[in-house]
Amino acid sequence: TDVFVVSLSSAIDFDTAKGSFGTEIDFGAEGFAKAKLLLELADLDVAKVKQANQATDILEAMQVWEEMFEYLSLTALKIEYADDQLADKVLADVPDINQLKMMSEMQIDMFLGQYPEQAKQLKTAISGFLEDKNGFKVSATAKNPVGLNELESLYISGGLTDSISFEFEGN
């Protein structure tokens, strides 16, 4: 019989005094791939969390969560992917990796047109991943907590990188 091992671990750091929340989730399928997600948030209204958890009506709880998200801020987001053989299997039938790289580069240029440095770094990371198929990392670290409701306007205005530093790595 074939043995298939899946692992999942998570850690949560919830500081009610500071109103901060952090979580790290690790997921892996032995012999295929592993992924890690790290998320750090600030300006969490603990009273709203309690209010939402005590709500007896789902609509009331959703409204409280919506109010809470108006003030929630991002401090960090990191994603790491380590490949064993999953990418090899998924990409085995791709007729031309160079064409896939070109298509991804076009999408990146459209999405990150205002951010040429980050676009170049992301294209290099994706190219490195597609050529070596071993790992990929992305991180976004706020210089100071950035409101989740501010992200869209910062992105559109071209000011996102004034508030958040981005790093991309592929190998």
Set out the residue ranges of the language-model regions.
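Glycine-rich, small/hydroxylated-residue low-complexity segments
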Residues: 1-171
